[in-house]
């Protein structure tokens, strides 16, 4: 469900930088000066799986201090009136000012859900300002760096909390319907992994050019900029994530890929390629990143880069290790490749397309419940406290990833081992290798129990 957010706050707190980051284009000047523009800027924004309209109240930045109760307020109230929720920005390095407090008063009186954002929180310089923001009475501030892209996952959570109805997953996933209506649209792909695994080399080989290594200019989001490429007739939208920064920034700031970087990259992708160095596969960080992909519900492909440096025996061991360490995506595709020479890229794109198709799988209710009947007949659920749990039926409300609802008499009594049995059976019966499978339990009573009472 679409919604509108308005970015409000005093001048120079980073509203335009955040606007550019969420929109993914330089639609707003980052260092606005009075007179540059007097119009509110609007754009279509995306954060993870959230798509929404964003309004940058640029008119606020052109107002003089003595017009705070006049023209500034009129611009603010127009933006607030059109918005479903507000992103109220302060500068964490400066702390609160009288202007901040005046805008906070407007936000409170509006009655609109307000997300307090302590921008410029990178480093220790913003800690005091972020703590001071509690005085505004707008709840806990979200520490953020719009310039560096830090804290976007926390902002995502805050938006979902402020607008639960608009951000809740729909029974019929709108994104799934869009994909089914246009099966030829590009697959959204992010390539992530440890430093020196060869991400930049691989992506530039895939794109056929090196231009992204010079990076987007400061202020334009690195998380949502994307480039479309066609490889052997298959359209891909490759996202410019943390691995595509300037060489200097890679050396200075990306000495290791943090969980936050991986999470931000995933939220803009449908298929995530976790790239591993064949000479040092499945280190702890590889597993942590792959686990994040699975928990986010994205389709996963493992890229075995620099595979020309090891023998075939090492690849066989990798298959065993993948199924051992990542049982929740058993059968995940593993592609040996070389980003340097381009060997294996055809297989990689084929694996991306195949995993994407599995990720979009929908299973009709009849075969789904035939499987359930066979599974429960051959291995009934265990009795708990002398009472057996009654498994009634199963449905699939959504795909991307395949998600199922199991109706039973006592959901809390079903052990995890039995849920794994059902999930593994689904994977095998309906050919769902390498993608997360989500299984939700719901209680379903006997509809005729009270019929004669």
UniProtKB/Swiss-Prot annotation:
GTP 1 binds at residues 9-16, 56-60, 119-122. Disulfide bonds: none annotated. Keywords: GTP-binding, Nucleotide-binding, Repeat, Ribosome biogenesis. Residues 3-167, 187-360 form the EngA-type G domain. Coiled coil: none annotated. GTP 2 binds at residues 193-200, 240-244, 305-308. Associates with the 50S ribosomal subunit. Belongs to the TRAFAC class TrmE-Era-EngA-EngB-Septin-like GTPase superfamily. EngA (Der) GTPase family. This is GTPase Der. The gene is der.
